Amino acid sequence: MKGSNTFRWAIAIGVVVAAAAFWFWHSRSESPTAAPGVAAQAPHTAAAGRRGMRDGPLAPVQAATATTQAVPRYLSGLGTVTAANTVTVRSRVDGQLIALHFQEGQQVNAGDLLAQIDPSQFKVALAQAQGQLAKDNATLANARRDLARYQQLAKTNLVSRQELDAQQALVNETQGTIKADEANVASAQLQLDWSRITAPVSGRVGLKQVDVGNQISSSDTAGIVVITQTHPIDLIFTLPESDIATVVQAQKAGKTLVVEAWDRTNSHKLSEGVLLSLDNQIDPTTGTIKIKARFTNQDDTLFPNQFVNARMLVDTEQNAVVVPAAAVQMGNEGHFVWVLNDENNVSKKRVKIGIQDNRNVVISAGLSAGDRVVTDGIDRLTEGAKVEVVEPQTTMADEKSPSRHEGQKGARA
């Protein structure tokens, strides 16, 4: 029994080994047959990929049509807003400051009361001057009465001619004294008036320079407060010396040159004024000239020492051919645009540009009104290629679509 079992186990192991050997031999014999099939499929796949790239969708672009417009010509420069007048308010008399009649930052008018110096000493001085004047007026009246009597007595030779002349001289002297007294009264009155410190100009007051209770003097350089006149307000900016002739020519033609003030980022128009004057010399260091413009500034959009961008309108070019700035490209040979024909084929065309800003460019030569130019999708263009002109919304939707990106990746693969 034991020998019989051993024999059966030996047969089973032999069958397993034989089956394994047969499977190994069969798999080796099929692999050479399968390889030619795979290799045969490769050229077909590559060819299909190339056909897919050739037959893929047209490159989408956005386009604009060249138009004719009246284009303003601006001269631009950097500038600083300055107050039309800046006045340091000082006391013209010495004394104790007893009151301030303004709030810091307040808008004041010329003649408004700003501060009060203790007027006591000036009132006393005025009273003394007025008293002396009254005394001398009485003396003059008495001298004139004596003179009248002397004149009557002189007719009867009761007084000498010398006495009459002496009395006349006394009257004249007293009249001179009264004139001096009147001047003293006026001076004392002026000192009293000056104890009331008023605004010399209209404008905005700054921070106070002295507190109530301090003894102040007419020699104090800091003053009491500084007033800046901001209605109107001035803008001083610079232009290259090459622009001087254009400005002078416009002035001689009698034009009122409009100046615009824009914010620091040059994105928001702050105010509009007019050219006031040009400086009388060029800065040799920078080769620029200073220009002053004046603004009414009723809305207080401009503030002293504010940095702004200035634009001055000097001329307007009529019937100029204009295209969006995005259409104009720069290459080794200069500026160019991609022009579309009726079949939406593109071609590169050199142009000469003129006036330009952030949005539009004037084409001085190379284009005509009505020509279509590519404004977006330029990086995908080649000479003579046919494109698909789409609206901006369509292009944005296509760029955000995952399926389109996946399709493009597949074509490139």
Swiss-Prot record:
UniProt-listed Gene3D superfamilies: 2.40.30.170, 2.40.420.20, 2.40.50.100, Helix hairpin bin
Cell compartments where the protein resides: Cell inner membrane
Topology versus the membrane: Peripheral membrane protein
Xref: InterPro entries: CusB_D23, Multidrug-R_MdtA, RND_pump_MFP
Keyword Ubl conjugation belongs to the record: no
GO cellular component: efflux pump complex; plasma membrane
Residues spanning the signal sequence: 1-20
Record flagged with keyword Nuclease: no
Keywords attached to this entry: Cell inner membrane, Cell membrane, Membrane, Repeat, Signal, Transport
Molecular function GO terms recorded: efflux transmembrane transporter activity
Major localization listed first in the record, in broad terms: membrane
NCBIfam families (alphabetical): PRK11556.1 (NF008589), RND_mfp (TIGR01730)
Family: Belongs to the membrane fusion protein (MFP) (TC 8.A.1) family.
Subunit annotation: Part of a tripartite efflux system composed of MdtA, MdtB and MdtC.
Protein's name according to its UniProt entry: Multidrug resistance protein MdtA
